A protein has these predicted regions:
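Flexible, solvent-exposed coil segments and beta strand-coil junctions
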Residues: 40-41
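Extended, low-polarity transmembrane helix blocks
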Residues: 1-29, 36, 45-53, 57, ...
């Protein structure tokens, strides 16, 4: 990886993971509404605490560059599943746009899974020890 790519990799990790950090925190403050929305879409609401934990912890892990391949794989699958489960009404332009956004983010996480966290990451420090 070239020098500029080493410096820019953390910015990419922040940009791709930030949405999950914010959404995980927002799910806490809107817990009842999110649980109901999940239930109405056929997803058991008892999964919500796990989703919140994984969104917040996974986002922080990617931002810090820790276990990036593992959490990128999780978010890759998560983005595809949420697109299919919650945004499958293509007659609704908003659902269609969110579906495509989720699929695009899945592509970004797949790329991160393939290439790793980069030089400025906790994963990189672990490999030096």
């Amino acid at each position: 990886m070239t020098n500029y790519m080493n410096f820019l990799s953390p910015i990419g990790r922040i940009l791709i993971a930030n949405i999950f950090l914010i959404d995980g925190i927002n799910k806490i403050s809107h817990y009842e509404g999110v649980a109901e929305w999940m239930f109405l879409n056929g997803v058991p609401d008892f999964l919500l605490p796990l989703v919140i934990l994984l969104e917040i912890f996974g986002a922080l892990a990617i931002i810090l560059g820790w276990r990036v391949k593992l959490f990128s794989l999780f978010f890759f699958v998560f983005c595809i599943l949420t697109a299919i489960i919650f945004h499958r009404d293509f007659t609704n332009n908003m659902d269609k746009a969110i579906f495509m956004k989720n699929m695009s983010m899945a592509g970004g996480f797949f790329f991160l899974f393939l290439h790793g966290a980069g030089k400025f990451s906790l994963d990189s420090l672990k490999n030096k020890v």
